[in-house]
Curated annotation (Swiss-Prot):
Glycans are attached at N762. It comes from Medicago truncatula. This is ABC transporter G family member STR. Residues 362-375 have a biased composition (Polar residues). CDD domains: ABCG_EPDR (cd03213).
Length: 817
């Protein structure tokens, strides 16, 4: 029931599927845009900062340096609008998008992200949002319709009938303009398929089939021509107008695309330079003192200004400070002084700094040079010689530490709260929605009277207080900034509160509502749907298993013609049997290596699909095993039948096949585990070959168990080749009362070596006679039944599959550390 309630509330968002219906909320959304956004509504982010530790060489010594990729970014994105994130290369656009989407590991991201005034957990963000990656990770052998149907099957609950899912898929195809490509394969380098623009729209479609409340897109126009790029953004605009919150990164949008954007966020070195409407950027730059020249594009001109300041001694601080509080910089700062060129032989000594100061005064034509302390620049923090990336270094760890210990937290951008200075009621409302320091749990925002636990924050009714305030609130992003905002009524820098990550986590635990099931479908249904897709891929990629079947068939024929008749009972045939069986096991092992590149290519699709709870990792592991089992059975049976009949083996055919079948299952599980751990198929091949060599060396063929040094004997017991090799020998020689005869000289050289008679050997046997048990005793095989070997082999296969699941579940996550 909880899931159905959540699905019902998502429908109230007037998403893409319902935006065209009469009586929808398009008019209401337009009214909201005219009434402006309010705190406690939409997606709010406060003081987002993210840093990493980088090793840098300074004065010949490697040191750890904290580098900020995001620094103190605050703002809001509301329903029905597109927020485009822009900036120069390395500005932190994708990092910022990942921070909002919950793709940064816990403990690394500072600040808070809220939806409708409620703090969000990573699991909740996955349930209400979708993320379209920059690379289109799709199965090339599926058609567009099949790709959408799979997304509908795993993203929509079973309460929705299959006919309804098909109807929704066709509606989505029409909305995205993919009607003509409905039954076209996605395609790849080897098979022609949809175009680049259509492929991008398919990637967007599979992420919105379940009508998410938030949609994140990383460079959706990358690699597309201008017409295709405009078409993609136009469809994204339709999605936003359906009631979703859309945030996307974009690089150098055309003028037509800029006209489709509702709000832009421009970053540089992880710092916020501008957030607001595109048509207000001209006023923003004029207020800063850098009006846009006639004929210039506003965004491109701002990027040029950013580059100019970034390469100057003053840095980006004037731009950041003006965006933060509307403080117009000193006139000297509006003409940035270029940095002197760096050379390997020149350091920033005090004398050189003095010379730079003199040059700066001359460059500004008599204008007083601003004090470096005005923008937080210290002489001791000039590390430009070592800073070779486009990220922001922490200016002063001690300063931030003093802020925390004093209880004064960094305030929000004035654009976000400047309108709350008019009345004490507004101040109280702001503190009540965003949060005040040290409030008892009973006064947390989640326990305000307007919160209804049965509905998600995005679709539930807003609180009574928020509705009262919405009529008088004015969007700070749409208002021209003035210099009289700060200090009119009170200083919010000492009272505004940005909850720390630890407090944010505690609030989540206390106030998280019942979100219903984490996944849309039960486990068995996920297995069935994933198995259906895997079968389609296997059928349309016959070379994957056909090549392995051909290899095993050809090698079975070759081995049969090389070893000829192995049914004779001479000493020479004993060594020939041992050689044949060890080669058969190794052949089966190496035939599974083709799973390395196939899974590595599929792994990126798995990460994309599971990053927002499309299905469970366990469903994926089990479904792939179910589909592959019949192919393993056929391959093992083919090899067993050919060699059994042509070589006249005395072994039991069913047991022979079962051992090969179990070997294929286990080796495939092992190769899948390796491919899940390595970054590329080249590394995967290297690891598989190296471990196979160790397994081969310690399986008991070259060195018997008693001949292996004690400190390496553990390798003998974990060898994946040991158990099938022993099982095949037991199947051939166990309970074989026939007598192998010949000269002892025929036993050496060979793998058998010196004979060690078994307990079944007695004096009544002929002089030069060896029983099958004698062969097993000589090979140090003490297992009483081959089924023990089969069970142990399958147990290793289960263990490999379990480790494979753990890697997929906990290691294969698309998040920053």
């Amino acid at each position: 029931m909880a899931r159905l309630e959540r699905d019902g509330t998502n429908k109230s968002l007037e998403s893409l599927m319902d935006s065209h219906k009469p009586g929808g909320t398009t008019t209401n959304l337009n009214q909201l845009r005219t009434q402006k956004s309010i705190p406690g509504y939409g997606l709010e982010f406060t003081n987002l900062s993210y840093s990493i530790i980088k090793k840098q060489k300074k004065d010949g010594v490697w040191i750890n340096k904290e580098t900020y990729l995001l620094h103190d970014i605050s703002g809001q994105a509301i329903k029905g609008e597109i927020m485009a994130i822009m900036g120069p290369s390395g500005a932190g656009k994708s990092t910022f998008l990942d921070a909002l989407a919950g793709r940064i590991a816990k403990g690394s991201l500072q600040g808070s992200v809220r939806i409708d005034g409620k703090p969000v957990t990573t699991s909740y963000m996955k349930m209400v949002s979708s993320y379209v990656m920059q690379d289109d990770q799709l199965f090339p052998m599926l058609t567009v319709f099949e790709t959408f149907m799979f997304a509908a099957e795993v993203r929509l609950p079973p309460s929705i009938s299959r006919d309804e899912k098909k109807k929704r898929v066709h509606e989505l195809l029409n909305k995205l303009g993919l009607q003509s490509a409905t039954h076209t394969y996605i395609g790849d380098e080897g098979r022609r398929g949809v175009s680049g623009g259509e492929r991008r729209r398919v990637s967007i479609g599979i992420e919105i089939i379940h009508k998410p409340s938030l949609l994140f897109l990383d460079e959706p126009t990358s690699g597309l021509d201008s017409t295709s790029a405009y078409s993609v953004v136009e469809k994204i605009k339709d999605i936003a107008q359906g009631g979703s919150i859309v945030l996307m990164t974009i690089h150098q949008p055309s003028f037509r695309i800029q006209m489709l954007l509702d709000k832009i966020t421009i970053l540089a070195r992880g710092r916020l330079i501008y957030m607001g409407r595109p048509d207000a950027l001209h006023t923003h730059l004029s207020g800063f003192g850098r009006p846009v020249p006639d004929g210039e594009n506003n965004i491109e001109y701002l990027l040029d200004v950013i580059t100019e300041y970034d390469q100057a001694t003053v840095g980006l601080d004037p731009l950041v400070q003006y965006q933060h509080d509307g403080h117009k910089p000193d006139p000297a700062a509006m003409t940035p002084v270029p940095k002197p060129p760096r050379t390997p032989y020149r350091r920033n000594t005090p004398a050189s700094k003095h010379m730079i100061s003199l040059r700066s005064q001359g460059f500004t034509a008599g204008t007083p040079q601003p004090d470096s302390s005005q923008f937080g620049l210290d002489d001791d923090d000039n590390d430009d010689d070592e800073n070779f990336d486009n990220s922001l270094e922490r200016r002063s760890v001690q300063t931030s530490r003093n802020i925390v210990t004093s209880g004064v937290y960094p305030r929000l951008a004035s654009q976000f709260y400047q309108d709350f200075s008019a009345k004490d009621f507004s101040v109280w409302l702001y503190n009540g929605v965003v949060g005040t320091p040290r409030r008892p749990p009973s006064w947390t925002p989640a326990r305000t009277p307007g919160w209804t636990p049965g509905k998600t924050p995005l679709s539930g009714p807003r609180s009574f207080v928020s509705n009262q305030h919405s009529a008088s609130y004015q969007d700070p992003y749409y208002i021209q900034k003035t210099n009289t905002v700060v200090g009119q009524s009170m200083d919010y820098s000492a009272t505004s509160y940005a909850p720390s990550y630890e407090e944010f986590e505690i609030e989540e635990v206390l106030d998280e509502p019942d979100l219903g099931p984490k996944y849309a479908n039960p486990w068995l249904r996920e297995v069935a749907v994933l198995s259906w897709r895997t079968v389609l891929n296997v059928i349309r990629t016959p070379e994957l298993f056909a090549s392995r079947e051909i290899v095993l068939t050809v090698m079975a024929l070759v081995l049969s013609t090389i070893f000829k008749n192995l049914g004779d009972t001479t000493f020479i045939d004993i060594n020939r049997l041992l050689n044949f069986y060890i080669f058969a096991v190794c052949l089966v092992f190496f035939s599974s290596n083709d799973a390395v590149p196939s899974f590595i290519m599929e792994r990126f699709i798995f990460i994309r699909e599971t990053s927002h709870n499309a299905y469970r990792a366990s469903s994926y592991v089990i479904s792939s095993l179910i589909v592959y089992l019949p192919f393993f059975a056929v391959q093992g049976l083919t090899f067993a039948v050919i060699t059994k009949l042509m070589l006249h083996l005395k072994s039991n055919l069913f047991n022979f096949w079962m051992i090969l079948f179990a070997s294929l299952i286990t080796t495939n599980a092992y190769v899948m585990l390796v491919s899940a751990l390595v970054p590329s198929y080249i590394t995967g091949y290297a690891v598989v070959i190296a471990t196979t060599a160790l397994f081969f060396l310690t399986c008991g063929f070259f060195l018997k168990r008693t001949q292996i040094p004690a400190y390496w004997k553990w390798l003998h017991y974990i060898s994946a080749i040991k158990y099938p090799f022993e099982g095949l020998l037991i199947n051939e020689f166990k309970n074989n009362r026939g007598c192998y005869s010949g000269n002892k000289a025929d036993l050496s050289p060979g793998p058998l070596g010196d004979v060690k008679p078994s307990k079944h050997h007695n004096a009544s046997l002929p002089l030069n006679c060896l029983l099958g048990e004698d062969v097993l005793s000589t090979m140090d095989i003490t297992m009483e039944s081959l089924w023990y070997d089969i069970l142990i082999l399958l147990a290793w296969g289960v263990l490999y599959r379990f480790f494979f699941y753990l890697v997929l579940r906990f290691y294969s996550k698309n998040e920053r550390k």
